[in-house]
Amino acid sequence: ENCEVRRKVHIGKAITRGMGAGMNPELGQQSAEENREEIEAVLKDTDMIFLTAGMGGGTGTGATPVIADIARDMGILTVAVVTKPFSFEGSARMRIAEEGLSKLRDRVDTLLVIPNDRIFNIIDASTPVLKAFDKIDEILKNSVRGIADMITASGLVNVDFADITAVMKDAGTAVVGVGISKGKDRAAKAVDEAINSPLLDSSIDGARGVLFSVSG
């Protein structure tokens, strides 16, 4: 009921009975498998899919690789944008997240990982946890929107779906950065902010491809 998207698939009705997967990725996996046909129906005629999840729990960690498998089998460009738990959530949740990322990495074209701990590099350390989660949700949204806008937005130089596919197909682990600036040299400052974002899980050194978009 809290999800406002137009089409929803309620996975695992028989397995979890609406109770969640309780940090058990196997239950999350079984839940997605239970509704495989419904997921396939929703993904029909789709060219590109973004999978977003918080790794470390049962549903996101277990179900996301299954959905990725379905999408790849259907020839869909599959991009996962996921988070890793805060350190204070405990070593067990972090271990589950790492195991889930290992499975997911081989099942998507492009994997973007945002460590939750990095959020405190851009917000005050005293920020309440719920507010921190809100900020992380905003970053996930902006990451997906930034890629989608490259295809849909009009500009002097347009990027089409073929360009996106050329860079993101079988790309492996990737990073995303967003920079905003104003005034003199704003473009250069925004680029510097984007490539040096404290949220990046790794450097862009050695990257085989780059998608770069400027708007404003």
PLM feature segments, named:
Residues E1-G216:
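Tubulin/FtsZ superfamily GTPase core signature
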